[in-house]
Each structure stands twice: as C-alpha cells, then as structure tokens.
C-alpha cells in the first residue's frame, strides 16, 4: 500500500496540469522480503489522463540492502494503470538485477495506491536473491 502526496501543481490554459509528487509505502518481493519504498517525480495530466510520468524510487529492503528504480512515462499504458520500470542501482545480491526492465500495475482507491511489480529474471539470479 502506497500513499501519494502532491508537492507542487501548475495549471495550464489548456486544462492540463504539471505536478511534482512523493510516494511512500511498503512492498513485498516474491522472495519473501519486504521493503519501504520512497519515490519522487513529476507528471503531466490532461482531462484526468496521464500524459507523462518520471519517477525515481528507493527501496530499503528488510535484509538491509537497497534497490533503486526509474519509471518513465513513454513506456506506460495510463488507461490500464500499467507501465514499465527499470532497476537502475542496488546493493548486495540485488546488484544482479540492475538493468532489468519490469512491469507494474496500479490502482488508486481513496488516495491510497495499490501496486504490483513483476520482473522476469534468470533462474540463477533468482536463486542468488532467494538465498537471503
């Protein structure tokens, strides 16, 4: 479960708006570890539709390691609430995941964001990560 905070907003004459934001919440990985996710970024919306999105997220993982991801709006399908993110940095065994592009799905209910991410990784990498 993730919370969204709009930090700035600019309205344009065509009805579109530019926002900066922060997202915080918890996530679970398929290996059973948990993480606290902190993101910041910006987005452009028009008529309630997402036009562009950029975001960087930092995950503090329950095994005392870290992972960073990047979301860019040109690989997302806003109407479905799905998109792609790339793992851009990590510590420890998670360095094996850097460079992977993953898929996410999200939905917002009462200002809370529910999200799920899926990353396909080689079995050898999964086994290394799952040992933690």
Can you describe what each PLM-predicted range is?
Residues 1-132:
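Beta-strand-enriched cores of mature, soluble protein domains
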């Amino acid at each position: 479960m993730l919370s969204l905070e709009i930090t700035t907003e600019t309205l344009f004459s065509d009805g579109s708006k530019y926002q900066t934001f922060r997202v915080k919440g918890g996530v679970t990985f398929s290996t059973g570890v948990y993480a606290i996710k902190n993101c910041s970024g910006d987005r452009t919306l028009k008529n309630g539709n997402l036009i562009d999105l950029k975001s960087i997220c930092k995950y503090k993982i329950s095994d005392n390691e870290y992972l960073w991801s990047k979301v860019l709006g040109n690989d997302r399908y806003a109407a479905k609430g799905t998109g792609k993110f790339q793992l851009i940095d990590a510590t420890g065994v998670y360095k094996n995941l850097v460079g992977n592009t993953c898929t996410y799905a999200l939905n917002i209910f009462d200002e809370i964001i529910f999200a799920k991410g899926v990353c396909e990784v080689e079995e050898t990498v999964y086994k290394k990560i799952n040992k933690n």
